[in-house]
């Protein structure tokens, strides 16, 4: 039976297990290399990575696969995922690969793949690569005269720094703003402080000392306790946390409170609408976006379009609907005028420009509407395939009937981790507890998400 290597966001797994190892990296390089060397021009692939210790091992295997297939390889070293998307376009590469497991801890790693246009590869293209990776003749190699070469891109960081700064209005500076950055000991640890410092901010940095094993460890966009404390201790204007690969953010206001992702989406959408910059009056988010966001956008004559969970699906729906703004409540924000993928640095610069334009604190800017209560639960499953899609669909249908018009229930498999995720959205807490109990009786033991 053919193995499925890809999830909802490329390939991801625990390093040196059957889910992710050097052999898989080599096969990926060989398979993708065969597909992206079609045509007569000299073919290039750009490879970036975050700061995980396994990145060296996987980079070497991936490089070997690509050069064996006849592609020249550009190596950037540690760099944010959106920088890989940008540089793939800028260097006229056929393909870009980011070695990362995003917000996961160092034991995991993976690959995100970008086409020559800077957008993540489609499901169809990933399926084509997956099929080649499963073939017995995957090791058929190019002629010795067609082997590719590899080189370092020494100015990769400086190229991305200038690209990100170009998204910030030329007439603005960040003078008089004190900002705390949490770089998650990840891919943004060099570029993020430099960008904000060059734009004039008083920058305080934590999570900027990666050692290969501390990426996302009690830091970053999913673990903001240290950043929230630092913002209060330093009396800062705000805090910004990035995840391990720099495509996702969390914002901490001047009071040390984390800004809800739905409020961030609403704030930016409102600003774009006021400036007549929001295309087709549409905002794209996911099925996880709060119902109160949809109601608020409707009240200002904007339409919320919901996509499946995952920033690549948000981007696909943005392109299909003609919208130039979308994102996930989890912190992936995409402004298509600036970037082809989620970019935490560029998104945070847009938040800062709004603060300066409106002369308001971030807490005032995001105080737009009350949220409907959402509770999130997770069931850890070593093999999600043990729980059938039909079982989850039937369970979801049953729970939706139970909650009726008082809210929403979403039960789904995570596309990047061995988890079944449950979201219950209602202000009726008794009903929420009843639904959780009912779900638990279906043989899913669901610990509360920390």
Residue spans for each PLM region:
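An N-terminal, well-structured beta->alpha segment
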Residues: 1-64, 68-69, 153-177
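Gly/Ser/Thr-enriched, mixed-charge loops and adjacent short helices
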Residues: 14, 109-234
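Proline/glycine-rich low-complexity loops and linkers
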Residues: 127-162, 166, 254-329, 334
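C-terminal catalytic subdomain
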Residues: 323-362
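Gly/Pro-rich interdomain helix-loop hinge
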Residues: 354-383
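Short amphipathic alpha-helix segments
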Residues: 387-402
């Amino acid at each position: 039976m053919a193995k499925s290597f890809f999830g909802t966001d490329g390939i991801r797994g625990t390093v040196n297990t059957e889910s992710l190892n050097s052999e898989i990296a080599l096969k990926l390089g060989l398979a993708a290399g065969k597909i992206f060397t079609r045509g007569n021009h000299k073919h290039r692939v750009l490879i970036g990575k975050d700061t995980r210790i396994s990145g060296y091992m996987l980079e070497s295997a991936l490089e070997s696969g690509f050069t064996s297939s006849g592609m020249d390889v550009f190596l950037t070293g540690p760099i944010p995922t959106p920088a890989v998307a940008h540089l793939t376009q800028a260097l006229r590469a056929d393909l870009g690969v980011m070695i990362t497991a995003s917000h996961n801890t160092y034991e995991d790693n993976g690959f995100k793949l970008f086409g020559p246009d800077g957008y993540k590869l489609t499901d169809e293209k990933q399926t084509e690569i997956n099929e080649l990776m499963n073939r017995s003749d995957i090791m058929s190699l190019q002629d010795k005269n067609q082997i590719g070469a590899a080189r370092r891109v020494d100015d990769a960081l400086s190229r991305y720094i200038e690209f990100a700064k170009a998204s910030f209005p030329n007439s603005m500076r960040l003078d008089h703003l004190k900002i705390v950055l949490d770089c998650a000991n990840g891919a943004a640890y060099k570029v993020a402080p430099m960008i904000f410092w060059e734009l004039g901010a008083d920058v305080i940095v934590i999570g900027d000392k990666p050692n290969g094993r501390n990426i996302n460890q009690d830091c970053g966009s999913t673990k903001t306790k240290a950043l929230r404390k630092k913002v209060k201790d330093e009396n800062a204007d705000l805090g910004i946390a990035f995840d391990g690969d720099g495509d996702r953010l969390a914002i901490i206001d001047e009071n040390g409170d984390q800004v809800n992702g739905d409020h961030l989406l609403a704030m930016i959408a409102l600003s774009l609408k006021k400036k007549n910059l929001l295309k087709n009056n549409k905002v794209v988010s996911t099925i996880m976006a709060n119902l109160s966001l949809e109601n608020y956008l409707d009240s200002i004559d904007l339409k919320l379009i919901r996509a499946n969970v995952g920033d690549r699906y948000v981007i696909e729906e943005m392109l299909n609907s003609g919208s130039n703004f979308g994102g996930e409540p989890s912190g992936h924000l995409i402004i298509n005028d600036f970037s082809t993928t989620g970019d935490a640095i560029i998104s945070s610069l847009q938040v800062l420009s709004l603060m300066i334009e409106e002369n308001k604190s971030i807490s005032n800017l995001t105080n737009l509407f009350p949220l409907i209560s959402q509770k999130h639960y997770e069931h850890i499953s070593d093999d999600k395939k043990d729980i059938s899609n039909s079982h989850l669909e039937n369970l979801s249908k049953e729970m939706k009937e139970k909650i009726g018009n008082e809210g929403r229930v979403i039960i789904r498999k995570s596309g990047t981790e061995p988890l079944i995720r449950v979201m219950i959205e209602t202000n009726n807490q008794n009903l929420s507890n009843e639904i959780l109990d009912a779900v638990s009786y279906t043989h899913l033991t669901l610990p509360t998400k920390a």
